[in-house]
Each structure stands twice: as structure tokens, then as C-alpha cells.
From Swiss-Prot:
Keyword Ribonucleoprotein: no
Organism: Escherichia coli O145:H28 (strain RM12581)
Name of the protein described by the UniProt record: Protein-arginine N-acetylglucosaminyltransferase NleB2
Sorted UniProt keywords: Glycosyltransferase, Manganese, Metal-binding, Secreted, Toxin, Transferase, Virulence
Residues that, per the record, bind UDP-N-acetyl-alpha-D-glucosamine: 45-47, 69, 216-219, 319, 324-326
Main location: secreted
Encoding gene per record: nleB2
Family assignment from sequence similarity: Belongs to the glycosyltransferase NleB family.
Length: 326
């Protein structure tokens, strides 16, 4: 058994390759280190709120000296030539910009553009009205001294304002143009995992197996070599930000060994049960913590050690040294 408090663990690829059947423990339970193999596809994401800021025939992904995001993706495609590299995109792109995306696919045999509107996420949707109804009913069932009348009246007012055309959690997030838009659909893409590559008519997807896992990387992650075979506790792991003597789970790099990973489904259940749920804090953080039985009694640093995805061939989170490209 591996200790959850470690400096190496599964982020040291050579160590786990020598003992692929090892387990790691957290909160008194052991979890198998499951395989994310060398054929598992890599997914990047670029949701562009202002496509008009690019030149007419330019790929609408930031690519400056300070933020060379497109270069980072094409560099990954060259290094990981045996993996499919997906770019999950959304935005009000022009015909010329979509043509530029198509040219990028032609230039790189293993690169695939995946448009958000082409992917069926309906199995993860819920009516906003149902979310409101559940919370309103819960408030009404409380005794008068514990009922929040102000909240109840506010929820009932907001419920009346939801039209049939707007009665969808997914549709609500699809209209946003902020980080919540980005984060929400990242979570759904990771629920699909490798299957998201089969949601396009592109013939490049024929090598992707149904239900296969996926490796998600933000575009500020720089590959310096092949990732090889990776192992993660129960098949899920993610980047941990370590700055200013604090640690935090980050959604900038996440690996899963299968679609519909139960830790991510736990996060989706939070998104389905709160009117003010946040896709990062609730949809990822709370879901993963709940799945692995993390409680306030546990040491958060130990949990971060347990869940951390780190790799010697990835320079993580380089945009922390610059201003946001958004």
C-alpha cells in the first residue's frame, strides 16, 4: 500500500510502472491505482467570449508571446503523435474561423476540433424549474421558526420567471460568457471523457473506444515529453496548486480512466440540487471530496497529496506567472 502522504506517488511514472497493482489509501479506505494508458486521448478546451478580436482567417485561440496557447497545443500534438488531441471549443465563430479550425485539423493528423454544440450533453441536464421546486418544497416542509420566508419568496419569484425555453441547466450555462461557462462544460466533457471524441463526424475518432478515459489539460500546460502510462486512485486525479504555503485542488489538469466517473457524477448531483451551485467549487471540488469520503475531520493537505496529478513531463499552470488572457 502506498501512503497518501508522499513526494512521489503516481506522479512519478517510473515508480508506478514497476508496481502497477499497488493501492493508495485515504480516510481508511484503499483505492486501486487504475491505468490511464499511452493511447488515452488528451483534451484541451478553448471557449472564446470575443471571437471578433482575432484576424479574419486566424484560428481563434490566443497565441501571443505571453500566452502561446495554440503553440502549446500543437507542441503537444507533435510530442504525443500516437494520441488523439482534442480541442473542445465554443463561441460565436465566423465561417472563416471555422475554416481555420479545419485547416488546423488537416495540418495535424491527430488533432480534432470538437464543437460544444455538436456534443449531446442532455443526459447530464436538469430542468431549472425542478431544482427550484425541490428547494422550495424543502423550505415549506420546515417548521415556521426554521423556514426562511425571504428565501422562499425569492425562489418562488425566480421560478415564475423561468420560461419553457430557458428551463435547462445546460442552456443556462451555454449562454454565459465567463469562467463558469468554461468550468461547467469542462466538467461535462470529463464525464464524457474519451467518448467526447466520438461525438463528432470526424473520421479521426475511429480509434477511440467507447467509455475510454481522458486527460484534460489547460492550454497553459506545456508538455516536454510523452506522458506514457499514468496511474490514478480509482481512476481520477487532478492538479494541485501549491502556492503561498497553501494547497488547493485545481481543474486545470484532470485525468480519468473512464467515462461517467462516479466522483464527477457526485459533483453533477450538487449542480442539480442548488440554484447557486458553482461548477468548480461544487461540481468538481465537493463532488470529489464526497466520493472519497473527505470530511472536515480530515487533513486537507493529505487529501491533496492523495488526489494530486503531477508529471515530470508537464510544466504545470504557466499562466500563474502572467495576467489572465481573458
Amino acid at each position: 500500500m502506498l501512503s497518501p502522504i508522499r513526494t512521489t506517488f503516481h506522479n512519478s511514472v517510473n515508480i508506478v510502472q514497476s508496481s502497477p497493482c499497488q493501492t493508495v489509501s485515504f480516510a481508511g479506505k484503499e483505492y486501486e491505482l487504475k491505468v490511464i494508458d499511452e493511447k488515452t486521448p488528451i483534451l484541451f478546451q478553448w471557449f472564446e467570449p470575443n471571437p471578433e478580436r482575432y484576424k479574419k482567417d486566424e484560428v481563434p485561440i490566443v497565441n501571443t508571446k505571453q500566452h502561446p496557447y495554440l503553440d502549446n497545443v500543437t507542441n503537444a500534438a507533435r510530442i504525443e503523435s500516437d494520441r488523439m488531441i482534442g480541442i473542445f471549443v465554443d463561441g460565436d465563430f465566423s465561417v472563416n474561423q471555422k475554416t481555420a479550425f479545419s485547416k488546423l485539423e488537416r495540418d495535424f493528423e491527430n488533432v480534432m476540433i470538437i464543437y460544444r454544440e455538436d456534443v449531446d450533453f442532455s443526459m447530464y441536464d436538469r430542468k431549472l424549474s425542478d431544482i427550484y421546486h425541490d428547494i422550495i418544497c424543502e423550505q415549506r416542509l420546515r417548521t415556521e421558526d426554521k423556514r426562511d420566508e425571504y428565501l422562499l419568496n425569492l425562489l418562488e419569484k425566480e421560478l415564475r420567471e423561468i420560461s419553457k425555453a430557458q428551463d435547462s441547466l445546460i442552456s443556462m450555462y451555454a449562454k454565459k460568457r465567463n469562467h463558469a461557462w468554461f468550468d461547467f462544460f469542462r466538467n461535462l466533457a470529463l464525464l464524457k471523457a474519451g467518448e467526447i471524441f466520438r461525438c463528432t463526424y470526424n473520421t479521426k475518432n475511429h480509434g477511440i473506444s467507447f467509455g475510454e478515459g481522458g486527460i484534460y489539460l489547460d492550454m497553459d500546460m506545456i508538455l516536454t515529453g510523452k506522458l506514457g502510462t499514468i496511474y490514478a486512485p480509482d481512476g481520477i486525479s487532478m492538479h494541485v496548486d501549491r502556492r503561498n504555503d497553501s494547497v488547493n485542488i485545481e481543474n486545470s489538469a484532470i485525468i480519468v480512466n473512464r467515462s461517467n466517473h462516479p466522483a464527477l457524477l457526485e459533483g453533477l448531483s450538487f449542480m442539480h440540487s442548488k440554484v447557486d451551485a458553482h461548477p468548480y467549487y461544487d461540481g468538481l471540488g465537493k463532488g470529489v471530496k464526497k466520493y472519497f469520503n473527505f470530511t472536515p475531520l480530515h487533513n486537507y493537505n493529505h487529501f491533496c497529496d492523495f488526489i494530486e496529478f503531477n508529471h515530470p513531463n508537464i510544466i504545470m499552470n504557466t499562466s500563474q506567472y502572467t495576467c489572465s488572457s481573458w
